[in-house]
């Protein structure tokens, strides 16, 4: 299993939460990945305290998140990757953007400044990040956001595996080197 973490850290901050928590099971023989989102507000026991699972990151970083998700899901996570908001945006931009069928409109001027219309479109990093972050305008809030996050990851994987221009490989590697922790 691989734990994928999207963090809400901003420059100058020492501690931050995991804004996106996705457990991935990779099956290389079937060439298939299964993604399961863990709601960020899930209550867990960590180091004797009850807290939201996303707060484990503020206590012990990605290692604490691995421990908490292992315990919650009863699995053994062997690797993790962590990316910040800025890092995700740069990664998507480094591969030329992603093609995605947006299942919902995004219009949340109080929290995000990009509007998105539902339907098939090409998204740059800023637009894809907005699509993956929006939750306040949906009745089911975080559940729609988690679905959007999985869509963005799927579109990113598709772009890298099927549509990526190999001449941009150095830009991709450079963007990854600053943001991934394994």
Task: Describe every region a protein language model picked out.
Residues 1-182:
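Non-catalytic, solvent-exposed segments at the cell envelope interface
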């Amino acid at each position: 299993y691989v734990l994928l973490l999207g963090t809400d850290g901003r420059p100058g901050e020492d501690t931050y939460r995991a804004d996106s928590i996705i457990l991935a099971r990779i099956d290389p023989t079937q060439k298939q990945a299964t993604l399961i989102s863990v709601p960020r507000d899930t209550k867990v026991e960590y180091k004797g305290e009850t807290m939201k699972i996303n707060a484990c990151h503020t206590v012990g970083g990605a290692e604490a998140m691995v421990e908490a998700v292992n315990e919650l899901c009863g699995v053994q996570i062997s690797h993790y990757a962590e990316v910040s908001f800025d890092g995700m945006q740069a990664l998507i931009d480094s591969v030329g953007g992603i093609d995605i069928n947006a299942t919902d409109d995004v219009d949340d001027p109080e929290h995000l400044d990009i509007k998105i219309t539902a339907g098939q479109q090409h998204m740059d990093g800023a637009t894809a990040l907005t699509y993956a972050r929006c939750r306040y305008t949906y009745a089911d809030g975080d559940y729609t956001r988690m679905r959007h996050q999985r869509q963005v990851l799927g579109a990113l994987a598709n772009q890298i595996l099927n549509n990526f221009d190999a001449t941009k490989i150095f830009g991709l590697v450079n963007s990854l080197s600053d943001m991934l922790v394994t």
